[in-house]
Amino acid sequence: MAEELVQSEKLLSLDPKLQEDFQQKVHDIRRKRKANALTPGVIYIGHIPKSLIEPQLQEYFNQFGTVTRLRLSRSKKTGNSKGYAYVEYECDEVAKIVADTMNNYLFCERLLKCEFVTPEKVHPRLFIGCNTRFRKPTKPAVTRYNSKRNKEEVKKMTQRMISKEYKLRKRLAEKGIDYDFPGFAAHREMRKELTCDANTSVSSQDPTPVCTPTVLERRKSVRLEQIEDEEEDDDEVVLKLPQRDDEVVVKLPQKVSSAAKRQKISKLGKKTNIKELK
């Protein structure tokens, strides 16, 4: 009351004699305005399709009346909609009409659930941050885990994991728990053994060895020996024709491979050289 009188004293009437009456009239008018002020109303909206977000909901529910505040509930972890929201209208009568009209309304293959929330049930912190723009969480732990590491970072990470494993085994031993489990240290030793065997082995059943020129030459020589053995086994090719009077056997000359040709040419060259010397 005192504040209103102070504000009304700032206004001056044209006639100084009627100043008190003027201030009283201004005070009465302002009090009537406050008495006739609209009380806001809040409605709860459930079963909202996940494709709808704040701007679309604001545009849709503004057709019933003036929407002062809107809050769509979102997940803090993923940022996706939880499927329910709270809308505040300028007038509570409009909010009640909207709740009755939109309840069980088929919208995007879903039945909307609308309820009017009484002022006693409205939490004072319900609409805090409703006007701020939503930003999707960055997930720094996921990006840090998926990032590529150099040799030094990998070494530090393995040392840290092995130290944690050692501390865990120590705590279990202090509590009298006899429990052995394969950890990072055992896996690391096993990987070292596998790498050593792969470097030293040459067999085809072992892990793939390092491809050096000596290994490649050795494999080529083994393959040539196998081809020569197969050619020695197959000396003649016999074709049996259907028998008329006498059985006819046709012998075809053996196909000579390129490796055998090279060996024959080298032998002939040696013989000619020996004859010339004689």
Curated annotation (Swiss-Prot):
Domain RRM: 41-119
Domain of life per record: Eukaryota
Principal location class: nucleus
Keywords, alphabetical: Nucleus, RNA-binding
InterPro entries: NIFK_FHA_Ki67-binding, Nucleotide-bd_a/b_plait_sf, RBD_domain_sf, RRM_dom
Pfam families with a match to the protein in the record: hNIFK_binding, RRM_1
GO molecular function: RNA binding
Record-linked PROSITE patterns: RRM
Cellular component per GO, a single term: nucleolus
Localization: Nucleus, Nucleolus
Identification of the protein by name: MKI67 FHA domain-interacting nucleolar phosphoprotein-like
Organism, as annotated: Xenopus laevis
